[in-house]
């Protein structure tokens, strides 16, 4: 009965009686009821049941109450409701509360019955360590997303861990991220293989392989195929994207598409739906297993239903939801779907009236394909189709780009109708449409809007066309929205990347199509996916009806290719068969998709791609559009997979295809292009060798016979089969000869966007940009290897041209098709009737072979690269170690050695990087590079020449740049090595050459403090400041002496990067350098060797210099190498000393610095080659004008420079100013020269002498920046250089790039004693600055100073190529050599010099070695005058890499690295700031060690241009300074810039004035004349800042020394800068680096400088910048003394004017221009490390510049600047050393109050390096490091007292073991476990262990024997082979198998060094291992296991002399 719950408050039926006691008498349960129904009644009633409701026994006072039959009660008023009112007896309130119930969302089991694309959530792990268990794996994966299931597979037979695991993530993203982050990572010592394994197939394959004993867990073949996981990933991604598309499309389409395995999205897209609804154009193929669109083949993960692959609506088809025309090429599927679809969107081709019956369409299509008429239909459809499709894809459809007459009746065959897709508009249109689609559909991409009306299929014609344009993505990769998005995403990135890499520059097909393709490549399955994912079967393959659908690869192809199947156009093609397309269509569609082979599918994909493009064109009015849309569509989901796939996974087939999309595009474009150009050839074109598919027609009709589609599953390797013979008349697309065949899949990689494909993965292997560029160039070169390639190229070029309707090979125009629209069908595509496309019978074989070969090649390349990388790393590590040791040893020795050593140290590094990249540069191993993406790429983009001769492997860069070795660095590692060797020899000769100079250079050793590159290592290497300092100094000297070298190094690194872009130029430059021979060698070697060895020359130079410098500099700097290290300590003592010394040292340093500047430039003296380069960069005239040629004395240089400056100024905005400045500079230079001549010995020179000016020069340089580099150089020369001799005019130059060279030259020119004096005089940053500053500056007329007679060499030295080598060599050599080489770089000076140099070098911080003085390398990146202290000041502008400065706080004064980050101009500023005593670290850190002078010679104008100063506007400054408006502001003045915050503005003014007034000031004040506007720097890769004139100080260039880009004329700079920079000056003042604030003229240095400033960071990876900064910091540390001086200056701003801050600013270092490769690498680096705002600004400026310049970079025209947030976030520095002193947050130490400096930070500058020993190893893995404070942290007394206390607590009888045990606990031994030679893991001592000491306790679980036996058996079953059970006694065993400590790793030895002992501690027996003998560090700890003798012997592997042979 049903009870009704009595609700609360509800009364009982008889409330009145309720609760009353029933008075009736009870009888036997019968009551005398008083109820209405009397008891009698009741009694009489025959009760069937009764129940005792109330029992008095239970309830007191109650009467029995019965209830009868649930209704009647024994008592009339029982108060209880009868049963009919039954109520729930439970308390009602308990139900008032609602419980939240979480119902688990049912998850579909993904098994063989799973329908639809399987979400890629399942990840397969392979090669796992057998110790990894589920928990560990779960924890490992949790970080990437929720883990649903974790399963580790064990061998069922022996329960052994198979190293395979399955992890199912809750989200696809989690799975992808896990794969991305865990794949190929080391876990528990094993490099694990992680891949998306959607259905666990790979895992099961692994499982079978392992269980069958074919492989062991560690030998499991998880090669490229496994890497194919990318394919899987891609497929999965595609699936996701397809799903997304499907979701969006289906929803929009409204068609109930069964999730096609093929193309999830295909259903969604109008295209998809259309396809599904509409019989496929390939209807005839529908019969393929494909099934209808609704029932896509399950084969393909996403159902790559692309018509090609499975019925899955190919992404291509997805293009337009309305793209009925583009239904899957699988006719059946489409037809079925079409028929099924309510008014299925027949392809738009089908006239709305024409319902393509499945059969009809199929037949029609077949016939159509065969019948050109049908195809012809397509073209006509093209436009109307577009509309039709549009309706389907309305959102995406853009009005048909090319209105094509509506495809004639879609009534044409269903196929026809499908093909009726509007004929591809002319390629151009298509491309445009594509582009438009790309842009327009980008949104659609993700979800191509389903055709608004499903009617699309029927009325598809209308939407069709729009659909194409609207949903090209759908068309292209309907199923791979991800891909599409990816494409868009990648498209943009890829395009940018390509542009950057010049990969895409001009793939003609890249125009619009390129974008689309790129998009597609990246995101669109059509191109990319189709090609890659579903290898588009060769035409022939396509022709085979079932070929494609059948193949799994088809599925991958379908991923992106399916819709792009070779016959994508067939939709359009259906209507308008294209000769090639027709065949393609026929083949691809005719060929049952299902039956198609992967190749066929690939081809088909290709065809689809092409066709689709065409179809898209008709439908989209842009095949590309459609394609693009599809791509986009596809990219939506595809992107998820594809994007990740492409990005993280090796390029898979799909990826390749995508990438190939470019080719596809190309193919499409090419196909279209053929269509466009009269494509009579298509009919007549000889088929590609492989007859199967004709080469992709212009790109539409016929997917070029794709190379055999790579194994469908291996997206990464889509090896196009040998190009199939193009259908007659169908030339293969030009892009890659194989392209036509491969077209969609381009050689899976080649054709693909090199960037996307190669970038993402070369054959599944991530490729560096360099590799890609190399490959691209190679491919481009080999591009024409095929007969068709040229045509292809043309096609590609004409991608945008409306493709001619492909000629049907004898096929009549499709009915209703307007052949004209057919253009989308490339004429090269055979007509529908054309059967030559039938894939080559051997195509599959060929494709398979190619795939295998490609895989093998990829594997080989991967292996080789890995090996090379490993070797590089190992060698580098060794080199680093060696160098470190050498440095340590040398630290104590003369800095010379250290410098040499340091130089050497970088060398290996560079070599390593170079080697890594070398092959790529060489294109070695790039089997497909030869394919050539197309002339367009290389031609338009001028791909970097990978034959770049890295004359200067970044040796100097090795020191500085090596740390930030560019990908390009390894471009020509071998070359670099050879070059290095050559350079070394050259360097050697240079050394000999420079030995005289070296004498002057000797001082450099004092500069080890400035161990820019090495300094980093030094710091890193050793906590010893001394070491660091000496190293730094050495390095700095190397870098200083090799300032050019280091910058060169850096530059070389940059050049390596640049070498990518400027490879050719750089090659030339480098070659020039090489030609120059020794000089080049000097510079290059200095750079290279600095990288290599810090260049032998630099080494010797540095050594000599070091010697001199040490001697000289040690006088003042008190062995600045070591003293600087001790500076911190000495600082106090030395402070006083230094103050005195400062004056002396400053004078001397100034002299030395001048000398050094000169000397350094000398040492960095541009080799003739470099000079030539410089000359090349700067016309001879210009050089002459600027004094670059500087054959004549500095005066001539000055005059020339002045003239040049004037000319340039006039050319630039402020000719007058420049002229004035130039004249002034000339005068100043002349005066200065005279003065200099008078004071030949800078050392002895009074403060007034030029040398001090040199210090000032840096200031002046910085201030004025180079108004005229010539002037600047002249000034520099006139100053110390002048003193040294005429050569000295190069001083500015030396300040710049050629500081060392100048010094060298100077040294040569100058009296040895003078040089030596200079060199010997330690350059105290402050002192020299002060002395020179006041006297020199004062001597120099303010007017003159601004003019800077001697143009400071921009650091072109590093940039070598900046100055035309011709002029540059002699003068440069002389002046530069003497100055640069002769004068060791004092940190301060070097800062200036370096400042300039860093900027000058490559105008990229990377390139620019961090000048010790300037915290931030003067790379244009950081305008920062490296004065962390002054937040607002440009000087304080933090280095680009925060990490660089981060570390030890920098004192504003010291750390004030007045290395303006502005390239040239900025460089000078650092000099200015150097007055503030650029941090010694800065100097040290500065990769370039250049005299301050160079830096100083930065015309204020020029300075602001690159990087706004943190100083008043020039105008204000000039006004304050009393300088003429046009006159560059001397750096000296600048140092006082308020922004600097060190010197009051007044002081600054005074200082500037003094600098200006100082006759010698010109050197410092000399403003580098900007190179004449007409002077054209060597063309750099577009977008690349000109490396040549990086430094603001182009003085050398003008003087012939520095090869830094001449700064923009001062006037120009001033005008521009004052307008922009100065307008931004406030920002500049506040340290804001507003690249945009400065208008850079590419022709002007300022532009370069700015670019450099902005690009420096760009070029230099942030870490590199950081490295430089760190170097600077290290150098600062190294130059503790100078720091103190600076501090003093800082302390007494009043003195600052006296001690020009610029002193510390070394002239901008000159750097060898980066090679194209380097440039490319840098460019490409944004793909790896992102791009920061500065670089973005720089790029934007560069872009604008390039656009204005119009250097013939076609890609520029194809490039549109779109704002994008910065993607680069500086990553923590990798090297501890990089973490220099932490920059003070406020920029001022005093304002910070007290804060603790970490020991690590202190170690950087503390003398004692013992702290390092105290430091725990960086890698503590396997190390048992007690968690107690280091011994050093605990007072010995404390320890001893503890020991005594313990001893006293023991009784004499107590065994000492306990004491020892406690002692062990008290101080555990440092142990580590690592691989043992005895057996597996072993335990090793990390510290000496005395005999009989307790080593470690054997820890484990105490278990009984029984348990031990059980466990032993279980462990055996589990496959745990080793036994970790240690018997304590007869009944106790310690089991350390599962838990324990390192003792478990102790191996057995028959001759052990330890023994086990059981001791009792607190009644517990413990096993303790005691040492039997003294154990040395790293000695393995062993003991005798003493196993009982057994019959089964365990072999002993101890290998000891008395080994027993067995353990038992």
UniProtKB/Swiss-Prot annotation:
Residues 637-646, 1011-1020, 1050-1094, 1105-1149 have a biased composition (Acidic residues). Residues 22-39, 265-293, 301-315, 360-381, 405-414, 456-491, 540-560, 582-604 have a biased composition (Polar residues). Pfam families: N-SET, RRM_1, SET. GO terms for biological process: methylation. Residues 1-20, 492-521, 606-617, 626-636, 979-997, 1021-1031, 1150-1172, 1378-1392 have a biased composition (Basic and acidic residues). Residues 1577-1587, 1681-1690 have a biased composition (Basic residues). S-adenosyl-L-methionine binds at residue 1985. It catalyses: L-lysyl(4)-[histone H3] + 3 S-adenosyl-L-methionine = N(6),N(6),N(6)-trimethyl-L-lysyl(4)-[histone H3] + 3 S-adenosyl-L-homocysteine + 3 H(+). Residues 1699-1710 have a biased composition (Pro residues). Residues 1-42, 249-390, 402-652, 682-725, 950-1172, 1309-1328, 1345-1461, 1563-1600, 1674-1712, 1814-1842 are annotated as: Disordered. GO terms for cellular component: chromosome; cytoplasm; nuclear speck; nucleus; Set1C/COMPASS complex. It comes from the Eukaryota. CDD domains: RRM_Set1B, SET_SETD1. GO terms for molecular function: histone H3K4 methyltransferase activity; histone H3K4 trimethyltransferase activity; RNA binding. Keywords: Activator, Chromatin regulator, Chromosome, Methyltransferase, Nucleus, RNA-binding, S-adenosyl-L-methionine, Transcription, Transcription regulation, Transferase. A motif (RxxxRR motif) lies at residues 1840-1845. Its EC number is 2.1.1.354. The keyword Transferase applies. Histone methyltransferase that specifically methylates 'Lys-4' of histone H3, when part of the SET1 histone methyltransferase (HMT) complex, but not if the neighboring 'Lys-9' residue is already methylated. H3 'Lys-4' methylation represents a specific tag for epigenetic transcriptional activation. Component of the SET1B/COMPASS complex. This is Histone-lysine N-methyltransferase SETD1B. It comes from Gallus gallus. The gene is SETD1B.
